[in-house]
Amino acid sequence: MDIRPARISDLTGMQNCNLHNLPENYQLKYYLYHAISWPMLSYVATDPKGRVVGYVLAKMEEEPKDGIPHGHITSVSVMRSYRHLGLAKRLMVQSQRAMVEVYGAKYMSLHVRKSNRAAIHLYRDTLQFDVQGIESKYYADGEDAYAMHKDFSTLKFDTPETNDELAKTVQSLALNN
């Protein structure tokens, strides 16, 4: 397994991952806009054959209302057969690191469906995001969203597990299936 910055050639794979997993879908030009505008913020997880199995699509807020430079997670998704391997966490951490190191971001924001317990657990319990409020009827189907925020002032990056360790885990899962 490899985690790396997204390339233009990855965009259709990212879109495919999104279409398989999430109700919020985007046109290819939206992925392209992110890739061109903030090339160091979006990352992909690829399998040994180079196929995109997960991604994080991220951006910097262009005109922040509070005047503070900060990033925003537009979308994150991992294909079902590759979940519970820590890929979403690794993708998010890579994007956070780039927001801080490349753009000087002070915090990151995102929205999550109130019904998405797995994502809320990842953001709140694993990645230490705080719920800032509820945005009523945020999604097209009328569901509310939690507006979440992660302050980078005390950010410390864990050393991610090596690609070799993750590859061994994936290989063992493949052998057991």
Swiss-Prot record:
GO terms for molecular function: protein N-terminal-serine acetyltransferase activity; protein-N-terminal-alanine acetyltransferase activity; protein-N-terminal-glutamate acetyltransferase activity. GO terms for biological process: protein maturation. It is found in: Cytoplasm; Nucleus. Keywords: Acyltransferase, Cytoplasm, Nucleus, Transferase. The keyword Nucleus applies. Residues 1-153 form the N-acetyltransferase domain. Its EC number is 2.3.1.255. One of its GO terms (cellular component) is nucleus. The keyword Acyltransferase applies. It catalyses: N-terminal glycyl-[protein] + acetyl-CoA = N-terminal N(alpha)-acetylglycyl-[protein] + CoA + H(+); N-terminal L-alanyl-[protein] + acetyl-CoA = N-terminal N(alpha)-acetyl-L-alanyl-[protein] + CoA + H(+); N-terminal L-seryl-[protein] + acetyl-CoA = N-terminal N(alpha)-acetyl-L-seryl-[protein] + CoA + H(+); N-terminal L-valyl-[protein] + acetyl-CoA = N-terminal N(alpha)-acetyl-L-valyl-[protein] + CoA + H(+). It comes from the Eukaryota. Catalytic component of the NatA N-terminal acetyltransferase, which catalyzes acetylation of proteins beginning with Met-Ser, Met-Gly and Met-Ala. N-acetylation plays a role in normal eukaryotic translation and processing, protect against proteolytic degradation and protein turnover. Component of the N-terminal acetyltransferase A (NatA) complex, which is composed of at least ard1 and nat1. This is N-terminal acetyltransferase A complex catalytic subunit ard1. It comes from Schizosaccharomyces pombe (strain 972 / ATCC 24843) (Fission yeast).
